[in-house]
Amino acid sequence: MKIWLSGIYEFFLRYKNIWVEVWKIRKELDHPNRKKDESEFLPAHLELIETPVSKKPRLIAYLIMLFLAVAIVLASVSKVEIVATAPGKLTFSGRSKEIKPIENTIVQEIFVKDGQFVEKGQLLVSLTALGSDADIKKTITSLSLAKLENYRYQTLLTAIEKESLPVIDLSNTEFKDSSEEDRLRIKHLIEEQYTTWQKQKTQKTLAYKRKDAEKQTISAYVRKYEGATRIEQEKLKDFRKLYQQKSLSKHELLSQENKAIEAQNELAVYRSKLNELESDLLNVKEELELITQFFKSDVLEKLKQHIENERQLQLELEKNNQRRQASMIRAPVSGTVQQLKIHTIGGVVTTAETLMIIVPEDDVLEATALIQNKDIGFVAAGQEVIIKVETFPYTRYGYITGRIKHISPDAIEQPNLGLVFNATVSIDKQALSSPDGHKIELGLGMTITAEIKTGERSVMSYLLSPLEESVTESLRER
């Protein structure tokens, strides 16, 4: 082992001594310094060997290396913005009002034109639904009849409770929508029903009186035969005493017993008739009371039905009136009419179809941008946005700045972009400046491109990211 180490030591020591000796005579080994014209007269191979190399290529190489070093330093230090690009358009803020009908209707009259300023509550357009006027007229007629029927049964109920003639007064304004014919008909019905009820009561009252008279007559006979029976019984007792004393014949005793039995039988017959009449009187009295009860119950039931019918008809009339009012479309706010889509009288508009948009006086433009799925993870509310309007080249007219105001939590499907997220961007100004200094107002629906600043990165990382991605992906291959 020592021999091997000493051999290595001798080897390096030898070359060290050689290098030291050569270094001592290094100047003697150089070619003599010759002038340019002296070198030109030397043989070609000596001229090539002894002519010094030009310093320009070396200087250029140094400059290139210096430039590369500066470029690497700047690329490592300098930062560039990370931008997410999203297409979109200019829209008004949520204060703009879309005017839509509530049902399929026909345009009756148009009172405004595109670009016109309207006040709140001003009539914009008059629509009419098929059959709406007929429905209202029919409901009013039915409601007036229902009110008359209610009055009819209410009047009858009052007459029943007070047991007096019904007081009929149909001159009230409540019945102004009903015809004279209907009012007369109701009046006659009230009188007829009340008269019929009174006739039924009168008939039963007369029947009761007849039965009561019969009762009085039978009661008299009962009292008569009660007295006759007592007398005949007393006489029978006396006849039996006389018969026992042999002062009276048996034939006379039997004759008296027969008279007593006949008196008792007559008394029993009339008592039976009296009981029957009392039962009939109770029945007639109950029937008399039932006539009033049934009539009152029927009146109450009919009154309840017609009150409910009137309530339903009143709701139906309110519904039809609301339907008519809804067809008279008025401005919900003061503002400017835009995107008017109806121009033909008699044209048909469908449910929820946008007829026009009312832009309030203080409304402002906003931008809506469609952020792609690949960028949504880096976009957040409050980030700065540069908005370029495609109508006006930004190199000549400039651009608009703004900030992300809101991002929808759910994606929507777009035919060309796939699933995207809708973002609202507030803009700092509502106009651009032309090259000659004129102010150009921005308009609703203009297409824009939103460049959202999501962060910063160094130029070096930007340049090396493709290489890093390629290396990473290549290392994953089998």
Curated annotation (Swiss-Prot):
One Pfam family named in its UniProt record: HlyD_3
Protein name: Leukotoxin secretion protein D
Database matches in PANTHER family: MEMBRANE FUSION PROTEIN (MFP) FAMILY PROTEIN (PTHR30386:SF27), MEMBRANE FUSION SUBUNIT OF EMRAB-TOLC MULTIDRUG EFFLUX PUMP (PTHR30386)
Family as reported in the entry's similarity comment: Belongs to the membrane fusion protein (MFP) (TC 8.A.1) family.
NCBIfam families: type_I_hlyD
GO biological process, one term: transmembrane transport
Superkingdom of source: Bacteria
Protein's cellular compartments: Cell inner membrane
Keyword Cell inner membrane: yes
